A protein has these predicted regions:
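Conserved C-terminal active-site "lid" loop/helix of NAD(P)H-dependent oxidoreductases
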Residues: 206, 225-253
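Mid/C-terminal beta-alpha module of Rossmann-like enzyme folds, strongest
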Residues: 177-178, 184-231
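Amphipathic terminal alpha-helices
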Residues: 257-267
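A conserved pocket-lining segment of Rossmann-fold NAD(P)-dependent short-chain dehydrogenase/reductase
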Residues: 149-169, 173, 177
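NAD(P)-cofactor binding segment of oxidoreductase domains
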Residues: 49-88, 93, 125
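Glycine/proline-rich active-site loop of Rossmann-fold NAD(P)-dependent oxidoreductases
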Residues: 118-121, 140-152, 180-191, 197
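Active-site Tyr-X1-5-Lys
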Residues: 110-136
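Active-site "gating" loop of Rossmann-like NAD(P)-dependent oxidoreductase/epimerase domains
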Residues: 91-114
Length: 267
């Protein structure tokens, strides 16, 4: 069986680690929940030498580069791990597409040279250049992190943006997609892992309210919502993400094809 080294054992990577343990793999990881300190260079290099596969879920610095590639990129390249690199990226690399569909052939912000610097898109391209399998993820939800939780906590919002759509994915569907790629030695390249139904965030919030018997939050304009810069940026992008390649190449399909099944499983 394989040995997986994970950089950044967080919410999503933790689910992947659990799934790989179930497949009989050995898993080591950096991060607060891992067994190796990211800054312990000797320990990390030793783990890199032993690992058959490497997965990074570490996001790039907002105004800087990718921490993993900056610290260990040379070691990754020199250790001949090109056929065993995996990276969790974001569908945000596609930028705003005015509601149009995007797939893995759609140029990213970095590839299109759109002028504005985007650390995530640049990291995405850097990992692809190294021969990695790059998983582009939309909005992630799952236990403890869903519209149900936001409604119960009084944090749910409804923003009045007609025709605004987002894609999303259940965290366990990310895990199953990455596991399929790890176990079956998927070809290098980008893979979108999202569900089958891009839709407005309001639609999901309203369904969550119905499931819980809660009243709907007030409908607000973007200005009235007084969102943080990060949250506001989220609403400035509008796209539908195709998952066709992951289905064809990985033999993957989401267990929760829409938010309806996903939220029902979280009740």
């Amino acid at each position: 069986m394989g040995q997986l080294l994970i950089f950044g054992l967080g919410y999503t990577a933790g689910r992947i680690a659990t799934a790989m343990h179930a497949h009989g793999w050995q898993v080591r990881a950096t991060g607060s929940a891992g067994d190796i300190a990211f800054g312990d260079r000797g320990a990390v290099l030793a783990a890199l030498g032993e690992a058959t596969h490497i997965l990074s879920s570490v996001s790039p610095e907002r105004a800087g580069g990718d921490p993993v590639l900056e610290a260990y990129g040379e070691a990754l390249a020199g250790a001949d791990k090109r056929g065993a690199l995996f990276y969790l990226s974001s569908t945000g690399v596609y930028g705003d597409r005015a509601g149009a569909w995007v797939d893995e052939t759609t140029p990213t912000i970095a590839e299109a040279g759109e002028g504005r610097r985007n650390a995530r898109a640049e990291a995405d391209l850097a990992w692809l250049t190294m021969g990695a399998r790059v998983f582009r993820l939309p909005g992630i939800y799952g236990p403890g992190r869903s519209a149900l939780d936001r409604v119960k906590e009084g944090k749910a919002r409804r923003i009045d943006l007609p025709n605004q759509v987002f894609s999303r994915v259940h965290v366990d569907d990310i895990a199953s997609g990455v596991v399929a790629a790890l176990v079956h030695d998927a070809p290098a390249g980008a893979y979108n892992l999202g569900d089958d139904l891009p839709c407005s965030g309001n639609e999901v919030t309203e369904h969550a309210c119905r499931l819980l018997g809660f009243p709907l939050p007030l409908l607000e304009t973007l200005e009235e919502a007084n969102l943080s810069e990060m949250a506001r940026g989220f609403y400035m992008e509008n796209r539908r993400v195709s998952n066709g390649k992951a289905k064809r190449v990985l033999g993957w399909s989401p267990r929760y094809p829409t938010y309806v099944e996903g939220l029902a499983a979280l009740l």
